[in-house]
């Protein structure tokens, strides 16, 4: 019995012990849960205090800023990569190509000279300073985006005058011609001793030189060889070209007035001459009876020629024999070029009739005045293998003075505005098999020339005229695909008289800010322009050789006007008719008059207008 009671008591003690430990475990679990909840609540409270809603809103902004910094850093690296690529893949090969081209030109020139030395001619090898390598005869400004007229000429810069001037009051220097190759330049003008109207006898000055850079970095033209052709030959209307053998020149030998020449039955005598690197001049008469058998008068175009495919190409114009094969081939052909935004109001049939008549002006007895291009093989023999190209009058206007230019790989032909169309014309030119082909021209509406009514500067309708003045444009601004965008030149900014020379950069419609030679009453005549770059400084310069009135020593003085081409934010001057009104926001660069001022400006201007308009 006691044993049974003890057994029951033992079981009760064990059950109470189990219940006690179970209670302890439950209390421990409960306490642990409470502690965990407390810690979680504290952590949550701390977290809420650290990241407020405003902080969460700012997170995207912070991410964006970081993204911008990363993008900027990557973009900077990309710019560096692009510049490296441009330098390695584009600029370096181009620089090497330009250097190679200059070296090859120099070697070609030297090889000709060595051959000449073998023939006992003896000569030196001229070449421009290294600063100009790759900066002559190239596309100087290649820009697809900038406004062409944001480029403009500086004030005229003082430099060494390489052109001789008259030394007496009756002296006259006129009709400049200039051409520059990668190795040297050539220049010529006519010298008349007894006034510019004397057509009986004249000299021809011819010079060969190179571009130099002074110790202070200034550009100057250095004449190395020159000659004054003072003999019994009356050379006129000469065109010059820089070739590997020196300075090639084409001239007419004139013994009568232009009107008398057109009324004659035989072509005008012409001569192909050359000033060699040794300073010796030689020339040869061309067989004009064969070469110009369909012509009654023929003259070089005054403007420079160009060396292309081992031939020298000269501009030529003159009168055709009526009913000759060349004349018949042009019968009924004409072209009408129109002014920008200024349409001729005449009936179309009347315009066509007047356009056709413009090729046969009454001044020359109704002869057809024709444009042409003459190419001659450049060799030690003068006048070798001459070939005459006569372009169709469905492309060219009435024949006139002109110039052949090469810039980069492109060739151009400038035609003086002697007919009704006042804006400057620049025809793209291609050559093949010794002949040239002219294509539809670039026109520069603001680059006009003065002319007699009805072919004055603002003229817009076809008419029969022989007027204007030689003022050639030089191709300056190009697209990257080599298409021409703009030109530099010095124009005479007057409606009718040869007055007011100004330099500017021109696009097809308008012109840049201008640089004046002097006052608006300054008399001037022919201008010819050429641009180049000093590669070392990356500065572009343009030279305008201009005939300027000079009442003290001679009636005209030929002045080489040098400007640097600058760039602004694209200010331009619009033109309708005349461009003599200044636009607000800019002013002309006015240079102090370089020649004498007249006391009686009113009477002086009247005389100037009458006198200037009388020049051919």
Curated annotation (Swiss-Prot):
The lineage of its organism: Viruses, Riboviria, Orthornavirae, Negarnaviricota, Haploviricotina. Keywords: Disulfide bond, Glycoprotein, Hemagglutinin, Host cell membrane, Host membrane, Host-virus interaction, Hydrolase, Membrane, Signal-anchor, Transmembrane, Transmembrane helix, Viral attachment to host cell, Viral envelope protein, Virion, Virus entry into host cell. This is Hemagglutinin-neuraminidase. Belongs to the paramyxoviruses hemagglutinin-neuraminidase family. Residues 48-616 are virion surface. Its EC number is 3.2.1.18. One of its GO terms (biological process) is symbiont entry into host cell. CDD domains: HN. The gene is HN. Residues 234-239 are annotated as: Involved in neuraminidase activity. Disulfide bonds join 172-196, 186-247, 238-251, 344-461, 455-465, 531-542. The C-terminus (head domain) is involved in binding the cellular receptor. GO terms for molecular function: exo-alpha-sialidase activity; host cell surface receptor binding. Mediates the viral entry into the host cell together with fusion/F protein. Attaches the virus to sialic acid-containing cell receptors and thereby initiates infection. Binding of HN protein to the receptor induces a conformational change that allows the F protein to trigger virion/cell membranes fusion. Neuraminidase activity ensures the efficient spread of the virus by dissociating the mature virions from the neuraminic acid containing glycoproteins. The keyword Membrane applies. Homotetramer; composed of disulfide-linked homodimers. Interacts with F protein trimer. Interacts with host CG-1B; this interaction inhibits viral adsorption and replication rather than internalization.
């Amino acid at each position: 019995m006691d044993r049974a009671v003890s057994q029951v008591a033992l079981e009760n003690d064990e059950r109470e012990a189990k219940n006690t430990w179970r209670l302890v475990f439950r209390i421990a679990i409960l306490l642990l849960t409470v502690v965990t909840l407390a810690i979680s609540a504290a952590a949550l409270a701390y977290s809420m205090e650290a990241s407020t809603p405003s902080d969460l809103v700012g997170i995207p902004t912070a991410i964006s800023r970081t993204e911008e910094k990363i993008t900027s850093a990557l973009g900077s690296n990309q710019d560096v990569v692009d510049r490296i690529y441009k330098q390695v893949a584009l600029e370096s090969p181009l620089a090497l190509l330009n250097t190679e081209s200059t070296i090859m030109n120099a070697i070609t020139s030297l090889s000709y000279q060595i051959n000449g030395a073998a023939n006992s001619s003896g000569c030196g090898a001229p070449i421009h300073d290294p600063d100009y390598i790759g900066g002559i005869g190239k596309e100087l400004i290649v820009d697809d985006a900038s406004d062409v007229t944001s480029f403009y000429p500086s004030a005229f810069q003082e430099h060494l005058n390489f052109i001789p001037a008259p030394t007496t009051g009756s002296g006259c220097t006129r009709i400049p011609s200039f051409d520059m190759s990668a190795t040297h330049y050539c220049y010529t003008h006519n010298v008349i001793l007894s006034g510019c109207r004397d057509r009986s006898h004249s000299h021809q000055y011819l010079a060969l030189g190179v571009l130099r850079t002074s110790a202070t970095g200034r550009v100057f033209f250095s004449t190395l060889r020159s000659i004054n052709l003072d003999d019994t030959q009356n050379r006129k209307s000469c065109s010059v070209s820089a070739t590997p053998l020196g300075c090639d020149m084409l001239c007419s030998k004139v013994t009568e007035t232009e009107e008398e020449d057109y009324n004659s039955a035989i072509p005008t005598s012409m001569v192909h001459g050359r000033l060699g690197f040794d300073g010796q001049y030689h020339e040869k008469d061309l067989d004009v009876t064969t070469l110009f058998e369909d012509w009654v008068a023929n003259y070089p175009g005054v403007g420079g020629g160009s060396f292309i495919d081992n031939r020298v190409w000269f501009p030529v114009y003159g009168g055709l024999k009526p009913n000759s094969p060349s004349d018949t081939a042009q019968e009924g052909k004409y072209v009408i070029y129109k002014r920008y935004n200024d349409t001729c109001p005449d009936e179309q049939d009347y315009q066509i009739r007047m356009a056709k008549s413009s090729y046969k002006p009454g001044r020359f007895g109704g002869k057809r005045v024709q444009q042409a291009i003459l190419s001659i093989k450049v060799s030690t023999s003068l006048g070798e293998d001459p070939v005459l190209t006569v372009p169709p009058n469905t492309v060219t206007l009435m024949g006139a003075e002109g110039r052949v230019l090469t810039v980069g790989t492109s060739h151009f032909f400038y035609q003086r505005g002697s007919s009704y169309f006042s804006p400057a014309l620049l025809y793209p030119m291609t050559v093949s098999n010794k002949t040239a082909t002219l294509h539809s021209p670039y026109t520069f509406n603001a680059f006009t020339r003065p002319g007699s009514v009805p072919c004055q500067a603002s003229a817009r309708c076809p008419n029969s005229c022989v007027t204007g003045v030689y003022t050639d444009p030089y191709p300056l601004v190009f697209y990257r695909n080599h298409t021409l965008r703009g030109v530099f030149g010095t124009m005479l900014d007057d409606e009718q008289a040869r007055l007011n020379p100004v330099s500017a950069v021109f696009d097809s419609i308008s012109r840049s800010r201008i640089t004046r030679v002097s006052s608006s009453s300054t008399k001037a005549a022919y201008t010819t322009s050429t641009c180049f770059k000093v590669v070392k400084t990356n500065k572009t310069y343009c030279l305008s050789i201009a005939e300027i009135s000079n009442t003290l020593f001679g009636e005209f003085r030929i002045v080489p006007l040098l400007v640097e081409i600058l760039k602004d934010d694209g200010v331009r001057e619009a033109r309708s008719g005349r461009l003599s009104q200044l636009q607000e926001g800019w002013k002309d660069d006015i240079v102090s008059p370089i020649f004498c001022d007249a006391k009686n400006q009113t009477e002086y201007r009247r005389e100037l207008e009458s006198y200037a308009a009388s020049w051919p």
